[in-house]
Amino acid sequence: MSEKHRGAAVAALLLAVCPLAAQPQGQPKQPPQPMSFFVTSTGVGNGANLGGLAGADAHCQKLAEAASAGNKTWHAYLRTQAAGNQPSVNARDRIGNGPWYNSRGARVAASVADLHGDTIEAARLGNNVSKASVFTEKNESIKGFGDQPNQHDILTGSLPDGRAYSDGADHTCKNWTSGSDGTAQLGHFDRTGGGNTSWNSAHPSRGCSQENLVSTGGAGLLYCFAIN
């Protein structure tokens, strides 16, 4: 074997035994992105009566602060309908611009358009909201379809595109102030029964009480997004 061939053989052997030697050195590992999205570990406790948008946002903020993420401003992913002199509010318009990351540093969506599948490509791919990537502010998994109890229903009041209904019916339990009469549109964080769009708009609740929400597979939980 020539000196040239012998050198090549030794180099190949070293790479096989010590593959790390082939990797570039001096590249520090990037720290994980801080949490900017979670599902609440608990509901408010009064069904869909959240105290309006302000009460829902305060619930997200309180849980985030307890998880050492209170340096951000948190909003609940909720839609309201026009009432009195107040116009409707789209859920997609109150959560900032993204990107958003879960409690383990994985990206859930790059932007509002990515989150809602506004383009054909984004709609085909879907966002990263799923049972494998959605966690609470405590970095805990949530019980979904097939678990006991099933708690995959998430309050949203929203159409799949994150916008408001135009049919005049109540989809928000009286703009999140009723714990009895009315109904609320629910999403499935695990996307069972509805494909890519079911994360935020799967079916209506049976009512607005805590018992009503539990009966269809929920616990009055919310999506929380950091807006900054």
Give the location of each predicted region.
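Bacterial N-terminal signal peptides
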Residues: V10-P19
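Bacterial N-terminal signal peptides that target proteins for export
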Residues: M1-V10
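A composition/secondary-structure signal for short, hydrophobic, low-basic-content segments
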Residues: M1, P19-A21
